[in-house]
Amino acid sequence: MKTKIIVIVGPTAVGKTALAIEVAKRFNGEVVSGDSQQVYRGLDIGTAKASPEEQAAVPHHLIDVREITESYSAFDFVSEAKMTIEDIHSRGKLAIIAGGTGLYIQSLLEGYHLGGETPHEEILAYRASLEPYSDEELAHLVEQAGLEIPQFNRRRAMRALEIAHFGQDLENQEILYEPLIICLDDERSQLYERINHRVDLMFEAGLLDEAKWLFDHSPNVQAAKGIGYKELFPYFRGEQTFEEARESLKQATRRFAKRQLTWFRNRMQVTFYQIGESGVQDRILSQIEEFLDD
């Protein structure tokens, strides 16, 4: 029997953390961060980590598990998330994955093999090469490869082609979880307002000092490449004014949110909820209750 988990995804600033905490309180759960930047110690404001008070109210995992000089990959996330979910489940609690790093979460849910003899970078590159193909073209590739897919869908076809390409045994790519995937969204102009407001609040909370610390200590590490930091580096180098850098950060974050939504819409089987609609949280909680009781 697969382990039931709740997955909360969506663009930045849409309210994933707040909902995850509410779900955890309601259903005796713990939150597992699905964010590639929140793993780094010292990067708190720019990554929008749950506050110390929020983390005290509900256990959070995969936050502050790396130094800024260390790398972190989808393979690392999948390995550590699996162990964390198993621990949470063994204690009779519900695991709630919440975050916006679509690649990490998709890799966890769909049982992608990111280790072994084939470097995971090669697997991810091959997967990306299949994205431009239409469903009809993918079906043709599946037929050419001599593969059989009982009920064709895009994700299943891509996964079968990936496994055939790398010579991996399909039966070894075990899908461990039965997820309910909730994707939060908002009307575009409202979402962009939320993003702009969040960036302003981050600066009020000390983002500039946090980014300057990263710039002074480790400007070329993986952690520094995340949105929220690298956009401010031109200001520190004297190449932009502060206002230009702040607007650059807002623009980059808006574009990132658009890419996130595209990923969740096209690559994952999600249930969308518009956060601006009346009673949306109650409807989400009701769906979760039905899912867990089924």
Curated annotation (Swiss-Prot):
Which reaction equations make up its catalytic activity? adenosine(37) in tRNA + dimethylallyl diphosphate = N(6)-dimethylallyladenosine(37) in tRNA + diphosphate
At which positions is substrate bound?
A: 12-17
Q: What is its EC number?
A: 2.5.1.75
Q: Where is this site: Interaction with substrate tRNA?
A: 101, 127
Q: Name one GO biological process term.
A: tRNA modification
Q: Which residue windows are coiled coil?
A: none
Query: Which cofactor is essential here?
Result: Mg(2+)
Q: Detail which positions bind ATP.
A: 10-17
Q: Which Pfam families match?
A: IPPT
* Chain residue ranges for the region called Interaction with substrate tRNA: 35-38
Keyword hit for ATP-binding: yes
Subunit structure of this chain's protein: Monomer.
Q: NCBIfam families in the record, alphabetically?
A: miaA
Question: Hey, which family's this protein in?
Answer: Belongs to the IPP transferase family.
Query: What does it do?
Result: Catalyzes the transfer of a dimethylallyl group onto the adenine at position 37 in tRNAs that read codons beginning with uridine, leading to the formation of N6-(dimethylallyl)adenosine (i(6)A).
Q: What is this protein called?
A: tRNA dimethylallyltransferase
Name the encoding gene, please.
miaA
